[in-house]
Amino acid sequence: NPNPVPIPLVDIDYL
């Protein structure tokens, strides 16, 4: 994940 996001569902890699 490129950016530290609190919610994995919002992560770019997840999308």
Curated annotation (Swiss-Prot):
It comes from the Eukaryota. On the 2D-gel the determined pI of this unknown protein is: 4.9, its MW is: 37.6 kDa. This is Unknown protein from spot 45 of 2D-PAGE of etiolated coleoptile. The lineage of its organism: Eukaryota, Viridiplantae, Streptophyta, Embryophyta, Tracheophyta.
